[in-house]
From Swiss-Prot:
Residues 1-8, 64-137, 356-486 are cytoplasmic. Residues 10-179 form the PNPLA domain. One of its GO terms (biological process) is intracellular triglyceride homeostasis. This is Patatin-like phospholipase domain-containing protein 2. It comes from Bos taurus (Bovine). The lineage of its organism: Eukaryota, Metazoa, Chordata, Craniata, Vertebrata.
Amino acid sequence: MFPKETTWNISFAGCGFLGVYHIGVASCLREHAPFLVANATHIYGASAGALTATALVTGACLGEAGANIIEVSKEARKRFLGPLHPSFNMVKTIRGCLLKILPADCYECASGRLGISLTRVSDGENVIITHFNSKEELIQANVCSTFIPVYCGLIPPSLQGVRYVDGGISDNLPLYELKNTITVSPFSGESDICPQDSSTNIHELRVTNTSIQFNLRNLYRLSKALFPPEPLVLREMCKQGYRDGLRFLRRNGLLNRPNPLLALPPSQPPAPEDADAQEGAVAMERTGGKDHLPPPREDHILEHLPSRLNEALLEACMEPTDLLTTLSNMLPVRLAMAMMVPYTLPLESAVSFTIRLLEWLPDVPEDIRWMKEQTGSICQYLMIRAKRKLGNHLPSRLSGQVVLRRARSLPSVPLSCAAYSEVLPSWMRNSLSLGDVLAKWEECQRQLLLGLFCTNVAFPPDALRMRVPAGPAPEPPQHPPSSPPC
């Protein structure tokens, strides 16, 4: 599919906690097709895909990266509200994991090869960052690419003085339209490396350049992207990514030779699973890659995953057996903890809010300045829209009230300048400049607009008087003539 004399790219889609699927795919590519990673022109990623792309380009330990994903998901599941709990700081957790796994010269390896998808806050446009000046700048770019508004916080992070949010909002799969781009997505669809769901539904949902087949399994995956599933589910997703990567390499004839799966000592006979893999590869070549290869055994997959990731997957399946964990898993203790949530949650929220406020103090001036600018921009935008809307209704309103008459001839007697000045209003006669006239005109417009929204409810004085029906007027009463005074 991609000969060595051509160029190609690799693009990882954003998927939240399902990024452990990317770890399985990246492990497969690095182990079975290292030339595919080493000779790729660019490796792109958005949101969680940017984290895997960064680890793949910089040569970081993928096993440790996958273990960090599982540990973060387990830490989020411990809380009542999961990742939305006030004490869970996603940005701080991602920054700490990147500081731990990335080497010191990671920015030198990433510049020019790694592309991180970002969404600019000012206009909502997509930006792909490919050059980094330091390790801190590379980490900050990943933090910006994974920052989901409201989910991770209210104030977006900044990179080189510009505010950015999650790159998946504007472009979740960078450069997907190019034919030489290998697209990786944990959602079944039209991506090159993705799960193959046995669904007959042909409907497709395309979300910011990501193809998602409309079926129940994808709906389940979408529900677990922001709220982490159980460790066993993450383990299966990582193994699924490894399987799908192998399927892609076999279908396109990109498996590196000698195959690490088949490299055994001469004295040791091939294992049954290796024989099955050989037979499956031959069957795939005979059928032209149309039939799906049967998935290899789980033990066989776990043997060739990175050792750190293998240990993390095994530890995720084992539950601790200490006394405290046993007591906390008892039903009465769990019921008591659930009943205490209305009392413990406000206390935990207050403590976490205080800690975040102290951590926010160094960035307060810059963030306050940004919020002030955004508030001013929003108010200015609303004023322009309101003025434009009122300006469209004003001419029609005036045309219904003002009647213009066209004169057919000039007046017989020309008016003098004094007569013309008498016709103009007094405020126009007394104005000294054109600016004064325009200011008065705007004042009249405001008074006229205020009059449009006022309703005259005043009644005349005789409106509420009781009127007698019309008829013959009653005769005045006749009084007897009074005797003259003595």
